[in-house]
Amino acid sequence: MLNIAVLVSGGGTNLQALIDAEKAGKIENGKISVVVASKPGVYALERAKNAGIEGIVLARSDYENVDAYSEALENLLKEKHTDLIVLAGFMTITNEKFTKAFENKIINVHPALIPSFCGKGYYGLHVHEAALARGVKVSGATVHFVNEVCDGGPIILQKAVPVEQGDTPETLQRRIMEQAEWKILPQAVSLLSLIHI
């Protein structure tokens, strides 16, 4: 059974998609055992509590620098015997030592079709603002492995979503979450859990 940690920084809608998929039996060989939040008071922790999943706050603000935070996070996840780390709206940077410690065990969902609108500065609404400014007709989401290059790891799954006339960054963000992120993130976790058997 794949021991899964989900890392969050906000409301946890992608976490909820994973919880729902697990409850529906769609993650056959995996279990979310812990949710780690990079700041206190985020709604994702309430979602974890409601699902009976341990929630831990490891606040980035409590650590002097990225290296200290990354080391604390690495130690916590090793203590929890984590097999797969899912970054689900985790807005905190970690260092290269962390990504190497969990090589091919960290995945991220990015709200665009990589290699478009990815890398440094492309997160949250910034991604959708850039897509609309560029005039693309299709955007979407990508689940990829995490390595030392921001949004540069191997792609696992992608799903395209049409950009509609009159879209705002907020409407495009919502459509991509509903039609792509909430679908392909659980699919990717399921695939990786089956490979883990």
Task: Give the location of each predicted region.
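N-terminal Rossmann-like dinucleotide-binding module
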Residues: M1-Y43
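Glycine/small-residue-rich loop that forms an oxyanion/phosphate-binding "nest" at active or ligand-binding sites
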Residues: D67-L77
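Glycine-rich phosphate-binding loop signature in dinucleotide/nucleotide-binding domains
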Residues: L77-D83
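Conserved small/polar residues in nucleotide/adenosyl-binding loops
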Residues: I195-I197
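Conserved acidic residues
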Residues: S33, D83, N104
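Short, surface-exposed acidic-centric catalytic microdomains
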Residues: N29-A68
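Donor/substrate-binding cores of folate-linked one-carbon enzymes
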Residues: A88-L192
